[in-house]
């Protein structure tokens, strides 16, 4: 990546924005962010107010969860990509934003996602995770297909038939947890562990205190939710028993992965914490946010797109002799484009945080701005990946956007903490599950349109991922 200091053809501007009155303005911004405007509108309004896509902001949750909430936001494609430059941005303890969960959530360790690339442990831990995925790549397709059949499609059909509606979001946690657990735990059934049938629930309880300060659950009156979840961090003691059961289950079940860690010089205890984080944050939370958006966009596009997807999927599988293989899936260009477009519009993790390692110049499309050493910065991905100076009709779901010549635009798909054209490696912060997430997105569409011709949905907006309910499922015509 080019050094920003080399790009001097743009006028230099002071970073616009106003942090306002101490504490009071930050709390007002928090209410606007979570309740009065919503995340998307809040960031757009800041850019519009200050006529700039590089602005000063009070980042939620703010007081009193964090004392360090005066940030500079990058809201366009040009400025956002500086977040990927390891020479400029320090990612130490910034994954969750302006607050960080205590080390007790990870057994006294810091998982690799919380450490910067300069940390000596980063390359070893990231390399371990990447090699673990590589060794299990032959399981991805057959294991996920079985999980979809056992935990998703049968239940979808049953609920639509018996109740006239099927809650897609409610079915996802069991399906995703079962797949991830079996993948990383030598194909063991999570129900045979101390978790029993409550694995997803234990995982959600462990995740809740780590994620809720930056979210809105929309299940309580605003003032009560804000008082309970955005002013103070929830004590670890409330979920300690859930955490202990998760650690016990993965310690006893992920035997091969833990053996691999020891061979690399990584302590089993530290490896367990990284596995738990990988399962909980990278995969479980990420997939349960991604899949509802995927079906929302495909569902809202209507029967015409459904027909095109079904035709492509079924014809390719027929050409492959009925086999669903990686080679076959890679030939489905429309399916691939639909998944990329979903990740462009609604990245599972919309915010990237870090602190400036040194003073540098960052560029928007029309100006340069000085970022001081130590400045806390944030990039809002849904604005960067919907940049109207990069994409035509940037806010629209265009299913074939990345087909044919459109593939050259993949470098502007940024959901994985890196460009889509780049790959996760031990020396970068790109999501280690990047390729797996994309494969699973394609595979769930393949399995769906093998079974069904079309469907209709009911969408209920939530803070980030929508709630998706299937109203009808039309089985595949012969």
UniProtKB/Swiss-Prot annotation:
Transmembrane segments: none annotated. Pfam families: p450 (PF00067). It is an enzyme of class 4 (lyase). CDD domains: CYP74. GO terms for molecular function: colneleate synthase activity; heme binding; iron ion binding; monooxygenase activity; oxidoreductase activity, acting on paired donors, with incorporation or reduction of molecular oxygen. It catalyses: (9S)-hydroperoxy-(10E,12Z)-octadecadienoate = colneleate + H2O; (9S)-hydroperoxy-(10E,12Z,15Z)-octadecatrienoate = colnelenate + H2O. InterPro entries: Cyt_P450 (IPR001128), Cyt_P450_E_grp-IV (IPR002403), Cyt_P450_sf (IPR036396). Its EC number is 4.2.1.121. Expressed in roots. Detected in stems, but not in flower buds, petioles, cotyledons or leaves. Heme binds at residue 431. Keywords: Heme, Iron, Lyase, Metal-binding. Belongs to the cytochrome P450 family. 9-divinyl ether synthase subfamily. Involved in the biosynthesis of the anti-fungal toxins colneleate and colnelenate. Can use (9S)-hydroperoxy-(10E,12Z)-octadecadienoate (9-HPOD) and (9S)-hydroperoxy-(10E,12Z,15Z)-octadecatrienoate (9-HPOT) as substrates, but has a very low activity with the corresponding 13-hydroperoxides (13-HPOD and 13-POT). This is Divinyl ether synthase CYP74D1. The lineage of its organism: Eukaryota, Viridiplantae, Streptophyta, Embryophyta, Tracheophyta.
């Amino acid at each position: 990546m080019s050094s920003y200091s080399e790009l001097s053809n743009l006028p230099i501007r002071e970073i616009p924005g106003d942090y306002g009155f101490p504490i009071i303005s930050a709390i007002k911004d928090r209410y606007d962010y979570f309740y009065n405007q919503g995340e998307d509108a809040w960031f757009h309004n800041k850019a519009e107010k200050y006529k700039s896509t590089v602005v000063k902001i009070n980042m939620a949750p703010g007081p009193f969860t964090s004392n360090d909430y005066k940030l500079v936001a990058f809201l366009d494609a040009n400025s956002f990509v500086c977040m990927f430059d390891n020479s400029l941005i320090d990612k130490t303890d910034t994954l969750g934003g302006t607050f960080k969960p205590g080390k007790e959530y990870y057994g006294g360790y810091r998982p690799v996602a919380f450490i910067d690339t300069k940390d000596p442990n980063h390359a070893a831990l990231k390399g371990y995770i990447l090699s673990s995925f590589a060794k299990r790549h032959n399981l991805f397709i057959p294991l996920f297909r079985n999980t979809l059949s056992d935990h998703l499609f049968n239940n979808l059909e049953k609920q639509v038939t018996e109740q006239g509606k099927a809650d897609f979001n409610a079915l996802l946690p069991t399906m995703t947890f079962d797949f991830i657990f079996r993948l990383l735990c030598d194909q063991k059934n999570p129900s045979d562990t101390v978790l029993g049938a409550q694995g997803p629930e234990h995982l959600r309880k462990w995740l809740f205190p780590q994620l809720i300060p930056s979210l809105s659950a929309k299940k309580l009156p605003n003032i009560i939710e804000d008082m309970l979840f955005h002013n103070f961090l929830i004590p670890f003691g409330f979920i300690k028993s859930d955490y202990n059961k998760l650690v016990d289950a993965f310690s006893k079940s992920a035997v091969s992965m833990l053996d691999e860690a020891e061979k690399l010089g990584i302590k089993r205890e530290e490896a367990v914490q990284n596995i738990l984080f990988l399962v909980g944050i990278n995969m479980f939370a990420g997939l349960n946010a991604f899949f509802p958006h995927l079906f929302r966009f495909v569902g809202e596009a209507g029967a015409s797109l459904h027909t095109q997807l079904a035709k492509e999927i079924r014809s390719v599988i027929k050409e492959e002799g009925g086999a669903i293989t990686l080679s076959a899936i890679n030939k489905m260009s429309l399916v691939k484009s639909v998944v990329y477009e979903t990740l462009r519009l609604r990245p599972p993790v919309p915010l990237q945080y870090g602190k400036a390692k040194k003073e540098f110049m960052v560029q928007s499309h029309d100006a340069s701005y000085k970022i001081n050493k130590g400045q806390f910065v944030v990039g809002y991905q849904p604005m960067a990946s919907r940049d109207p100076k990069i994409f035509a009709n940037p806010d629209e779901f265009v299913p074939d956007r990345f087909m044919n010549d459109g593939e050259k635009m993949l470098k502007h798909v940024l959901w994985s903490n890196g460009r889509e054209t780049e790959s996760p490696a031990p020396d970068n912060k790109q999501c280690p599950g990047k390729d797996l997430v994309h494969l699973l997105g394609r595979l769930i569409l393949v399995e769906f349109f093998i079974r069904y011709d079309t469907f209709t949905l009911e969408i209920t907006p939530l803070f980030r991922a929508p709630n998706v309910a299937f109203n009808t499922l039309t089985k595949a015509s012969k």
